[in-house]
Amino acid sequence: MDFGKRISIEAVEEGNEFMPKFDDRGLIPVITMEESSNLVLMHGYLNKEALKLSIETKQAHYWSRSREQLWKKGETSGLYQNIKEILVDDDQDCVIFKVEVEGSGASCHVGYKSCFYRSVENFKDLEFVEEEKLFDPEGVYAGQENPTKL
């Protein structure tokens, strides 16, 4: 599978061909949303291989910047993200995956449904908007390095 060649602004903005624009590291950001509710589940990155695999298999694959490797969401946890729709923005430098999540429906490695489980109150303090974890990350990811970096 090859993506379209970016030959004109008009073709990128108004055309019918998918011509994703990857950054200088070969990545494009992706926002992943629950199809049924439009809840934002996570933000990640795709390289060409991850995007191609996601399209071909209809299961979300991502590029991990912290581990510098391709990963299929749900491979360890069983919480696979089945892609129902892919949207692209006007200049094709960001995509949205609308997904249905298997199992408990969680997408966050911390155990919550959404990685956006806290809101910023008063522009400085964090308040939990999700209070209940849908799975125990210690049980699911035992022995694996936490992907969060300081």
Model feature map: region roles:
Residues D2-L27, E34-L41, L46-L150:
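C-terminal binding/interaction regions
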